[in-house]
Amino acid sequence: MSINTLKNKKQINRLFKKGKTSIFFPLMFYCIESKEPKVLFSISKKKIAKAVERNKLKRQLKAIYVEDFSWNLNKHLAIVYLANYVCDAIELKEAMQKIKDTYEKD
């Protein structure tokens, strides 16, 4: 399964301004209804300085998303990494599971 990524600047701005926000450390989620599901992964250079570490985290987040987020229908989703350190995959998966449980209730 491939990931349909969110790239349109207007859609990204709308998501961050009007989207529903949830924080499950080390991740922050923005979610808004849309016609087709798209996802955005964001990790700040200020928090994780080394590109190798940022890319590894993004790969881990994408793998978890593909594995567990088949429920994400008709929503744009932004996943923002908040921690100042590199988390392990288990911690990321737990945060993603919490957000999945939260949005399945809606």
How would you label these PLM feature ranges?
Residues M1-D106:
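Positively charged, solvent-exposed patches that mediate nucleic-acid binding
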